[in-house]
């Protein structure tokens, strides 16, 4: 796991949405540093949202970003439940269809970028439509 820089002395508490947005920006920058290209953020389709859509070569990468202050209760990566995976798969399916694609025609994968405290973990191909 890599360490993420933090800012100390923050004058106010962020809302849950602001915190999520902050970590999504961190994840985007971190993935761009690893060579992925940004496509979209906060993509909403019927009943679901994908935090980031990136490209790695010819592969479309759907990214779920998670943050937990500590590893208590399993940390950030453990919070991507089966139910959440199903919702992400459905949202990606709809997004692909809107862009004239499908899981059969587009090379894609589902990654998780999990921030636990100041540590970042990138789980490539964390789950798929055959899970």
Swiss-Prot record:
Pfam families, A to Z: UPF0102
Record-linked CDD domains: PoNe_Nuclease
GO molecular function: nucleic acid binding
Gene3D superfamilies xref list: 3.40.1350.10
NCBIfam families, sorted: PRK12497.1-3, YraN family protein
Record HAMAP family: UPF0102 (MF_00048)
Protein name per its UniProtKB record: UPF0102 protein YraN
Organism: Escherichia coli O139:H28 (strain E24377A / ETEC)
Gene: yraN
């Amino acid at each position: 796991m890599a360490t993420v820089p933090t800012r100390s002395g923050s004058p106010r508490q962020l809302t849950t949405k602001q915190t999520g947005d902050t970590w999504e920006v961190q994840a985007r920058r971190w993935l761009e540093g690893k060579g992925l290209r940004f496509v979209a953020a906060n993509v909403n389709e019927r009943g679901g949202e994908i935090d980031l859509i990136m490209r790695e070569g010819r592969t479309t990468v759907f990214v779920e970003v998670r943050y937990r202050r500590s590893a208590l209760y399993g940390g950030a990566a453990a919070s991507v439940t089966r139910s959440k995976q199903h919702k992400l798969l459905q949202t990606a399916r709809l997004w692909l269809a809107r862009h004239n694609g499908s899981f059969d025609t587009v090379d894609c994968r589902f990654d998780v970028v999990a921030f636990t405290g100041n540590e970042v973990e990138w789980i490539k191909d964390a789950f798929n439509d055959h899970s």
